[in-house]
């Protein structure tokens, strides 16, 4: 029996990174977690690292500013997965260029998964500013990966359930509203809602799979392809409470960007892409893409219905 690939996870204490670490350990991969020396002053992250260590992970100290430490870490594994923070923290995405250089020098990596996990940046040339900067930076990382001929898989995980299912896609809210809910336009634009733990499982499933080599893997669980209105209706049925629905036009929604912080403007522009334009599901997967739930039907993914039960 072929041995499982050794996996290095960069950003393993982050929101999605911790799920990938958990999945890697659960699926039997020798798991390594890169951590920066600055982390030792953060008690919560240290506790998380020690918990992973207790479960079998190996901790490797390295820094984006220390090329040799990165190369040394990369040489110990077969696969590198980056889950560094994106969003308005754009410098973290571009720091992956240093990781690409280390992987290129090490020369032993069989697969690299860069930090994407949201909308496919390769399809977002039209994206609105300032939210487009996230996609621009991710494309720069892709270009570096491909120029270095590094075997890779890009992952488009769509909407993280923890951020938007509970809050019914209300900006700045992650728990269900009790009285009213804003619907974007008519609320009927289809989106894809994915449990973060499932993102971790699908990611680890993909790293040794030849079907995902040098392709984009889209995570589209069929039962979770739902409009915002459908998600709201599911919550109303589950909770037994009706909400006052307020439709907001695209013009009024975008007018709300004025006077907001840079980070909030990025969030608003991403909501526009998802819930007005429908950029999560307004395209067919092409020959350079694959779909996770079709590749791995054995994964019992979490449906939106069952995810919502935790909020009762």
Curated annotation (Swiss-Prot):
GO terms for molecular function: lariciresinol reductase activity; pinoresinol reductase activity. Keywords: NADP, Oxidoreductase. It catalyses: (+)-lariciresinol + NADP(+) = (+)-pinoresinol + NADPH + H(+); (-)-secoisolariciresinol + NADP(+) = (+)-lariciresinol + NADPH + H(+); (-)-lariciresinol + NADP(+) = (-)-pinoresinol + NADPH + H(+). The keyword Methyltransferase does not apply. It holds the Pfam family NmrA. InterPro entries: NAD(P)-bd_dom_sf, NmrA-like, NmrA-type/Isoflavone_red_sf, PCBER-like. Substrate binds at residue 270. The keyword NADP applies. NADP(+) binds at residues 11-17, 36, 45, 142. It comes from the Eukaryota. One of its GO terms (biological process) is (-)-pinoresinol catabolic process. It is an enzyme of class 1 (oxidoreductase). The active site is at 138 (proton acceptor). Its EC number is 1.23.1.2, 1.23.1.1, 1.23.1.3. Transmembrane segments: none annotated. Leu-164, Gly-267 and Phe-271 are involved in enantiospecific binding of (+)-pinoresinol while in PLR_Tp1, a 'Val-267' and a symmetric substitution between Phe and Leu favor binding of the (-)-antipode of pinoresinol. Dimer. Reductase involved in lignan biosynthesis. Catalyzes the enantioselective sequential conversion of (+)-pinoresinol into (+)-lariciresinol and of (+)-lariciresinol into (-)-secoisolariciresinol. Can also convert with a lower efficiency (-)-pinoresinol into (-)-lariciresinol, but not (-)-lariciresinol into (+)-secoisolariciresinol. Abstracts the 4R-hydride from the NADPH cofactor during catalysis. Belongs to the NmrA-type oxidoreductase family. Isoflavone reductase subfamily. This is Bifunctional pinoresinol-lariciresinol reductase 2. The gene is PLR_Tp2.
């Amino acid at each position: 029996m072929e041995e499982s690939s050794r996996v290095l996870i960069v950003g393993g204490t982050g929101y999605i990174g911790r799920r990938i670490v958990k999945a890697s350990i659960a699926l039997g991969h020798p798991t390594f977690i890169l951590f920066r020396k600055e982390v030792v002053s953060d008690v919560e992250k240290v506790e998380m690292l020690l918990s992973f260590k207790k479960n079998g992970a190996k901790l490797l100290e390295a820094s984006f500013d220390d090329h040799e430490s990165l190369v040394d870490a990369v040489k110990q594994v077969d696969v590198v997965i980056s889950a560094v923070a994106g969003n308005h923290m754009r410098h973290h995405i571009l720091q992956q260029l240093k990781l690409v250089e280390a992987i290129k020098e090490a020369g032993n990596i069989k697969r690299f998964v860069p930090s994407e996990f949201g909308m496919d940046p390769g399809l977002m040339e039209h994206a609105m500013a300032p939210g487009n900067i996230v996609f621009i930076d991710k494309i720069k990382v892709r270009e570096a990966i491909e120029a270095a001929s590094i075997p890779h898989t890009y992952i488009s995980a769509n909407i993280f359930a923890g951020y938007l299912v509970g809050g019914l896609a209300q900006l700045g809210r992650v728990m269900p509203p009790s009285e009213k809910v804003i619907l974007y336009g008519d609320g009927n634009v289809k989106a894809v809602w994915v449990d973060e733990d499932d993102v971790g499982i699908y990611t680890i499933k993909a790293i040794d799979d030849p079907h995902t080599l040098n392709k984009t893997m889209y995570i589209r669980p069929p039962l979770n392809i739902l409009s915002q209105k459908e998600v709201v209706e599911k919550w109303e049925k589950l909770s037994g409470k009706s909400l006052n629905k307020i439709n907001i036009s695209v013009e009024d929604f975008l007018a709300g960007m004025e006077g907001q912080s840079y980070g909030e403007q990025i969030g608003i522009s991403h909501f526009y892409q998802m819930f007005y334009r429908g950029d999560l599901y307004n395209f067919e997967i092409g020959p350079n893409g694959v779909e996770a739930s079709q590749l791995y039907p054995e994964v019992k993914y979490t449906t939106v219905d069952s995810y919502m039960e935790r909020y009762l």
